[in-house]
């Protein structure tokens, strides 16, 4: 459901661009899209505005927006791979609430980092913070599951890596790049905040199941 919702919002956002001949370029981010610029300005999360109590709704709207097809595709791949098991564990309604809370947790840490490091006027969009919460929950609930991963050594091969290793390395990467102030359009601290939120939910859920003897 969340995957479909993100895809629908993406194409609705870019709908005005389809009237122009350059629309394939805007979908892949190779040409600036007037429509996405307007949408980001209104529904993207801007830390400075949130701090002033403005546009609080962007905590939710920003996590369903994507800048281009590559941005959307990368996020939806992670949501597709890791989301189904977590959703089956939590149940549909709880999973939706968990996803939204993870997005808020991700945005909250991003806001704090943006205010501390600068960039508080730059809007943020994307589902990656909320999806990082899904990764955090998966890290706790399915640590021994194997993740098929493309590895580039002297040749390209596929290796089955335990989730605890794959996601652990992913988190360390996000934390380190966030700590050195790396940018490049990636909200590293949002990923950290979402992942930690997911871990908290995962640990709480596992403790709840143990109390019930499940």
Predicted features, each with a name:
Residues 1-214:
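A detector for small-residue-rich transmembrane helices and their helix-helix packing motifs
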């Amino acid at each position: 459901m969340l995957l479909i919702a993100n895809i629908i919002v993406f194409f609705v956002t870019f709908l005005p661009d389809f009237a122009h001949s350059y629309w394939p370029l805007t979908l892949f981010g190779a040409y600036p899209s007037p429509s996405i610029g307007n949408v980001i300005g209104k529904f993207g999360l801007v830390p400075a505005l949130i701090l002033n109590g403005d546009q609080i709704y962007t905590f939710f709207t920003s996590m369903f927006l994507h800048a281009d097809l590559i941005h959307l595709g990368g996020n939806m791949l992670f949501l597709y791979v890791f989301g189904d098991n977590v959703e089956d564990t939590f149940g549909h309604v709880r999973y939706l609430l968990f996803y939204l809370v993870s997005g808020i947790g991700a945005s909250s840490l991003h806001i704090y980092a943006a205010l501390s490091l600068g960039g508080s006027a730059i809007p943020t969009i994307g589902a990656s913070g909320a999806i990082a919460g899904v990764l955090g929950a998966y890290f706790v609930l399915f640590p021994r599951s194997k993740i098929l991963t493309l590895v580039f050594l002297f040749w390209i091969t596929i290796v089955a890596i335990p989730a605890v290793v794959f996601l652990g390395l992913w988190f360390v990467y996000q934390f380190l790049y966030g700590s050195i102030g790396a940018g490049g359009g990636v909200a590293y601290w949002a990923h950290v905040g979402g992942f930690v939120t997911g871990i908290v939910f995962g640990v709480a859920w596992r403790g709840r199941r143990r109390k019930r003897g499940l």
